[in-house]
Amino acid sequence: LNREDPGSWNLRSEVKGRLLSFGMQPPASDLDGTFCQNGQLYLKLGSNTLAIMPLESIKLRGEHNIHNVLAACVIAAALEIPLEVMRSCVERFSGVPHRLEFVREWRGSQWYNDSIATAPERAMAAVHSFQEPLILLLGGRDKNLPWQDLAELVHRRVKHVIVFGESASKILAALGDVQPGETLQSIQHCGALQEAVQAAAKLARGGDVILL
C-alpha cells in the first residue's frame, strides 16, 4: 500500500496477511517497505535497510514514476525477487508507448509523447516531470473535463501552449480565466494535431521540450 496516499493507506486495516508499503519518505519503525532518501532507493525489511539503486539509474521522468518504481520493487520484495534482479529490470525499462515516451531529438529540442494522458491531472503530472522550457500541445476530444488547475499550471510553467481539436475552445477559455503568469509567452489555436506539431516545430529552440 502507498503510505502517502490516504485512500490507499486507509485500507491497511483490511490487510489479512503481511503488510508491505511504499512511499518517498522512510516508513515508521514498525513498517516494512520501500522509500527514497539522498538520491537512493531503499528497501526496509525489519531491522535491515537495503540499497536497491540510485535514482539516476531510473530512465523514467517524473516523481510519479519514482512512486511506480517503489511500488514495483516492494511487490518484487514480497515475491522474494533478488535486489540485483529488481535493479536490472528498472535500469532496462524505458517506459511504455504514449506515456511520457521519448520520440526523438530534433535541432536540440526533445519531443515527448504523453498522449495517454487524457485527463488534466495526468497532463499536470507530465508537466511537473520536466524542468526544461516547455512547449505544450493540448487538445483532442472534449470529455467535459475541468481545465482550471491545468490552466494555472500552464501559466506558471509552460513557455508556449498550442491547443487543438474538440476541446480547444474550453482549454482556451480556462487559460483566459487565469491570471497571466510570467512564463507563458504565447497561446496558439490549431485545427488538428498535424498542424499543432508543425506550429511547435517552428517555436522550438535548442534545450526545449515539446510535450504532447
Regions found by a protein language model. Give the residues of each.
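Short, charged/polar "capping" segments at the starts of alpha-helices
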Residues: 5-10, 27-30, 144-146, 168-173
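Nucleotide phosphate-binding/pyrophosphate-handling subdomain across enzymes
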Residues: 53-159, 173
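C-terminal helical cap/extension that packs against the catalytic core
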Residues: 148-208
